[in-house]
Amino acid sequence: MIPRRSCWLILLLNLLNVQSLLDASWWSTVAQLSTALAGHNVKPVCELPGLSPGQAQVCELFKDHMPAVSIGAQNAIQECQRQFTGHRWNCSTHYSTGMLGPIHKMATREAAFTYAILSAGVTHEIGRRCKQGLLTSCGCSDETKPKNVPTDWSWGGCGDNVEYGYKFSRDFIDIREKEHDPKRNHDNGRSLMNRRNNEAGRKILKRHRKPKCKCHGVSGACNMKTCWMQLPSMEQVGKILRNKYDKAIRVQINDRGNLQLLADEATKERKTRALPTDLVFMDDSPDYCRFDRHSGTLGTEGRVCKRGSGGAEGCDSLCCGRGYNTYTQEVKSKCNCKFEWCCKVVCQTCNNVTQVDICK
């Protein structure tokens, strides 16, 4: 069994991988991961090369927050994969390392989505852990009672501490973007893009929190209600960000060192301003149809598709015109279950033959 420390260390590496521009120090982090899995001594997590100097300092001050950072990042990646299931880009990780790979070296709309949802995921997990009393430097939310909560309802339950999660996520995640050399034009533009998308993810999470109430009274009479503020689920956040991904705005760095909105390539219309919750990107997306080690795309060969579907998961789209192979597989499942007195359920095993279509 892998020690608990190694488990959350693995998850933390997912977040560091997305943030990193994949310099040599990142690969040394991967090497240390292998050492950790082998059960040998490794550097303390705050000394891992994947952390920027500023992040290492924050890590040292808030070591008990690091499991929340790692779990929040993992939850975000899982939600990313759920939102893009059946698409050519499906937020896949590299099978050999469990990491997202060099695809985030490019300033694409996929990178924009990933940065935003990772930032939201860390904020979400930190806020929840504050509520649960698992972090020493925070507790329940101290938000005031919203105007839309009736006056006769009690406000004072223990709510998710989104304010603390928001601040910690901003301090820990964004600090590496502030450490880039502002004289390097492209790096500065990418850093501004990353920070904006990080902030969009956090703002979406914060804006969609809602009061949650619990009834008190004899036999469910609900004579009294106690309410508190609760964060949206990561699935809700993922759906909102998925819509933002489709409407992401292309930008470039101008002579003043700021992000400038570009005209939409399809409509030729230029937005005069972007909302704080809009996602922005700078580069075209690569061809996700074929495996490319340089760009980090895994390709769609071997992916399961849906024959006859006109959507993204359909074989015509997902297989990129290469066609597909159909295989027959036998699946065993429980069937004809009956309750026997007393007290067990007895089932038969049935064999079901199904067909599955796999992209060439």
From Swiss-Prot:
Record's signal peptide: 1-37
Q: Which SMART domains match?
A: WNT1
Tell me which residues are glycosylated. 90, 352
Entry similarity comment? Belongs to the Wnt family.
Q: Which GO terms describe its biological process?
A: anterior/posterior axis specification; anterior/posterior axon guidance; canonical Wnt signaling pathway; cell fate commitment; cell fate specification involved in pattern specification; embryo development ending in birth or egg hatching; interneuron migration; motor neuron migration
User: What are the recorded GO MF terms, alphabetically?
Assistant: cytokine activity; frizzled binding; receptor ligand activity
List the subcellular locations: Secreted, Extracellular space, Extracellular matrix
Q: Give the observed phenotype of the deletion mutant.
A: Anterior displacement of the nerve ring in L1 stage mutant animals. Defective ALM, BDU, CAN and QR neuroblast migration and irregular CP and CAN axon growth and guidance. Double knockout with cfz-2 results in enhanced CAN migration defects, but the same QR neuroblast migration defects as the single cfz-2 knockout alone. Double knockout with cwn-1 results in ALM, CAN and HSN migration defects. Triple knockout with cwn-1 and cfz-2 results in enhanced neuronal cell migratory defects.
Where is this protein chiefly located? secreted
Q: What is the scientific name of the source organism?
A: Caenorhabditis elegans
The record's account of how the chain is modified after translation: Palmitoleoylation is required for efficient binding to frizzled receptors. Depalmitoleoylation leads to Wnt signaling pathway inhibition.
Q: Which CDD domains match?
A: Wnt_Wnt5
Keyword Disulfide bond attached: yes
Q: Which PROSITE patterns match?
A: WNT1 (PS00246)
Lipid-conjugated positions (O-palmitoleoyl serine): 219
Q: Which GO CC terms are listed, alphabetically? A: extracellular space
This chain belongs to which protein, by name? Protein Wnt-2
Q: List the disulfide bonds.
A: 80-91, 130-138, 140-158, 213-227, 215-222, 289-320, 305-315, 319-359, 335-350, 337-347, 342-343
Tissue expression, as annotated, is: Expressed in intestine, pharynx, anterior body wall muscle, vulva, some pharyngeal neurons and SMD head neurons. Expressed along the boundary between the intestine and muscle or hypodermis, but is also expressed in the hypodermis in cells including seam cells.
Answer whether the UniProt record assigns the keyword Endoplasmic reticulum to this protein.
no
